[in-house]
C-alpha cells in the first residue's frame, strides 16, 4: 500500500462507520415512529370509547330521572281504568306535566317564549297571512312551541306571521 491509499482507506472506514451509525439511527427512529403511531391509534380508540361511555352515562342519568314520571303516568292510567273518572286523571296529568317540566328545566331545556314580532333566530314562519290589521311580521299564531337547550335553540317556534296584502299582479300595495 502506498502512502496515498492509507488516508483514503481510513476515510472510507470513517465514512462507512458514519453510514452504519446513520442507518442504525434511521432504524431506531422508524421503530420509535411505529411505536408512536400505535400509541396514537390506541389513544384515538380509547378516546372514542370514553366519549361513548360518557354519552351513555349522561343518557342513563337523564332517563333515570324520567322513570318516576313514567310510574306516575301508569298510576294515573290505572286510576282511570279503576274509577272511570277523568276528573282525577286530568289533575294527575297536570301534576305529571309539571314534574316533567321541572326535570327538563333542571337539565337545561326551556320553552321559548315567543315575542310579538317575528325573530328569525327563534321563530320559523310556516304560514303567512295577508292582513292590514296587524303590523307586518307580527306573530298571529303559535303553531308549535320551540325549545332551547341551555342557550342553543334546538327547535324554533313555528309561527303564523302577518304580511302586507299584495296587489293583483303580485306587487305590494302602498
From Swiss-Prot:
GO terms for molecular function: adenyl-nucleotide exchange factor activity; protein homodimerization activity; protein-folding chaperone binding; unfolded protein binding. Its main location: cytoplasm. It is found in: Cytoplasm. Keywords: Chaperone, Cytoplasm, Stress response. It comes from the Bacteria. The keyword Chaperone applies. One of its GO terms (cellular component) is cytoplasm. Coiled coil: none annotated. InterPro entries: GrpE, GrpE_coiled_coil, GrpE_head. CDD domains: GrpE (cd00446). Disulfide bonds: none annotated. The keyword Isomerase does not apply. GO terms for biological process: protein folding. Homodimer. PANTHER family: GRPE PROTEIN, GRPE PROTEIN HOMOLOG, MITOCHONDRIAL. Belongs to the GrpE family. Participates actively in the response to hyperosmotic and heat shock by preventing the aggregation of stress-denatured proteins, in association with DnaK and GrpE. It is the nucleotide exchange factor for DnaK and may function as a thermosensor. Unfolded proteins bind initially to DnaJ; upon interaction with the DnaJ-bound protein, DnaK hydrolyzes its bound ATP, resulting in the formation of a stable complex. GrpE releases ADP from DnaK; ATP binding to DnaK triggers the release of the substrate protein, thus completing the reaction cycle. This is Protein GrpE. The gene is grpE.
